[in-house]
Amino acid sequence: MSTLQAVKYSRGNLEVLDQLRLPHEFHYDNVSTSEEAFDCIRSMRVRGAPAIAIVASLAHAVELHNGSCRATSSEEVISYIHGRLDYLKESRPTAVDLTNAINQLKARTQELAGQDRDAIIKAYIEEAENILEKDLKTNLSIGDHGADWLKDVAQAGPDGKISVLTHCNTGSLATSGHGTALGIIRTLQSRGWLNHAYCTETRPYNQGSRLTAFELVFEKIPSTLITDSMAAALFALQKETMNISAVIVGADRVVRNGDTANKIGTYQLAVLAKHHGIKFIVAAPTTSIDLETMTGEGIHIEERKREELTQISGATVGSDGSVDVAKTVRVATADQRIDVWNPAFDVTPHDLIDAVVTEKGAVVKGTNGEFDFSHVMPERWARLVGQQ
């Protein structure tokens, strides 16, 4: 398993890798308050739905451990905790993992209504730590199920290997470790089933070139970086020779019918994959599945500031090709007067998705063309869907 860590945690202390400095520099920020966590998430120093939920949950655990709560009564303590969680929820509203983690933490503390303040605080901290621990186990299971499913359905080459394309960053840097979509790629590689991995640049924030390419090189996985606009040409010209069999992406939110919100550019890859007969797979923990939202039309899509599209920062490169991480420069990539539309996510319709791979197994559409998640999350399904 990768030794890359987006989050370093021990009780009372949280460090978060500043991913804006990658791939040239490793720097961890101390995050000890909800305000610092909010800024860390909103500024995208940490990103990826699972990692966002983990940072928000643990940041409040750290401030509770360090004595931030002055309330004494049970009711006041619970009110304080829930208020901080409501604040953190607004840091990245599209990511359903954050909402689910907050609901889980609220429910756990509410169970202890009437008990003393220390018991409630202790329960919160333990529940937040459980979210971190469970995420890693979940990712390893997603990797196993995804690799198994692809081995069964993908057309492997003479050597039994396949090539895949991934988008954005869904690896150790987006989770507690191993990753979701990139976790499947890691598992394919470890089993000797991977020929080659392609990753998109993922404009405008370049998570693919800055983060995924970095992880692939770090893991010594055979890989190639392409721009987002090269995917169609890649499929047309190299699908057969490189045996490109799947596009594997993560998800910030999967709704009940399977429509999936993910990093902007995901939808167009699904359309291209369909046209070229390439499997399109969403890798997501069940915590990313939103059973309360029926279709993608109900997903709130975050829009980000215009400068992310018209400007870019990076380390300077010398005439000899050396990178000087001590010197960064911000440059304009467009006329600064141009209007900009900059949605952070798009929604891929479920009919373009071949499988949603969770820690409980791969879910495929039934004969009616619809996804049914009841068998991978029976309790939540019964509670939320069975009542309707």
From Swiss-Prot:
GO terms for cellular component: cytoplasm; nucleus. The active site is at residue 252. It comes from the Eukaryota. One of its GO terms (biological process) is L-methionine salvage from methylthioadenosine. Keywords: Amino-acid biosynthesis, Cytoplasm, Isomerase, Methionine biosynthesis, Nucleus. Pfam families: IF-2B. SUPFAM superfamilies: NagB/RpiA/CoA transferase-like. Its main location: cytoplasm. Pathway: Amino-acid biosynthesis; L-methionine biosynthesis via salvage pathway; L-methionine from S-methyl-5-thio-alpha-D-ribose 1-phosphate: step 1/6. Belongs to the eIF-2B alpha/beta/delta subunits family. MtnA subfamily. This is Methylthioribose-1-phosphate isomerase. It comes from Verticillium alfalfae (strain VaMs.102 / ATCC MYA-4576 / FGSC 10136) (Verticillium wilt of alfalfa).
